[in-house]
Amino acid sequence: MKLGLVSAILPGFTFEELMDYAAETGFGCVEICCWPVGKAVRRYAGVTHIDINNMDEDRMEYYNNYAKSCGVEISSLGYYPNPMDPDPETAKAAQDHIIKLIDASAKMGIHMVTTFLGKDKNKTVEENLDLFRKIWTPIMKVAEDKGVKVAIENCPMLYTKDEWPGGNNLASTPYVWRQMFELSPNLGLNYDPSHPYLLGMNITKPLYEFSDRIFHVHFKDIKINQDKLDEYGLFSYPSLWHSPKLPGLGGVDFAGFVSALNDIRYQGCACIEVEDKAFEGSIEDVKYGIEQSCRYMSQFLGK
């Protein structure tokens, strides 16, 4: 298992600065955020460390060589939109960019794209499963033809009132995953234990059942404020009663989680996803949070 970093937390860094910092900190890999250049639609989105819309083969070779010179692997090309958005233009733009990422990932020899499945928040799960098959069948045909794995993060994307009532990502439960995996052998999970923890689910059980579909891993923690949960209730906006935290500062049992990853012989990349407002006051705060997270997770990975 290789410990890495999700690049979204360092939006002001160039690709070179990002890879240099990752190497200095002791990371073995980085998930590179590849959003289209433009205004961010939410926190930690809209980050572009590789602009695939302005990249030729020479530029691809440059990125690969620079990463190699740093001794840091590019674990995947990451982009987390809603390709099943109820607005057709928004959905189509997301789908098209995912396909571009698949093509770039194949050409660069990365063969991994990390993203969201998407969801129409106003439709039922069953209706969304039908929509998923319609939208994702052609996308996965491209991925299969190019030998690229697509790792879907298991985040419900249901935190605030603008994501109400159903959330913006369908792929948050085993019930959905079983049907999702029927579509393609190249479709798997970018598994983050903080999401099932938030949903009150067992965080390690899915690793054993879906061991062959754990393509990529995120390390992120969650802190639940019980007083606020008592006030608002479980069916309120989750942002009212929980906070994303650095690994080790919330409720996720990372010793047990990494132990389960070892049990299933997971040998891929596991990237720390730093999302913690307590460590975002300045770039020094951000770096401190990253480095603390690296030290904390290294004790479990033997780095």
PLM region spans:
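Histidine-acidic metal/acid-base catalytic patches
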Residues: 1-29, 34-36, 68, 109, ...
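A short, structure-level motif marking secondary-structure boundaries and short turns
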Residues: 2-5, 47-49, 85-87, 123-125, ...
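Charged, low-complexity surface patches
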Residues: 11, 56, 94, 132, ...
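Active-site acidic/histidine proton-transfer and metal-coordination neighborhood
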Residues: 17, 61-73, 83-191, 198-199, ...
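Short, well-structured secondary-structure segments
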Residues: 28-34, 73-78, 111-115
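Glycine-rich, proline-tolerant flexible connector loops at the mouths of alpha/beta enzymes
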Residues: 33-62, 123
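Positions that flank functional sites
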Residues: 37-38, 81-82, 120-121, 158, ...
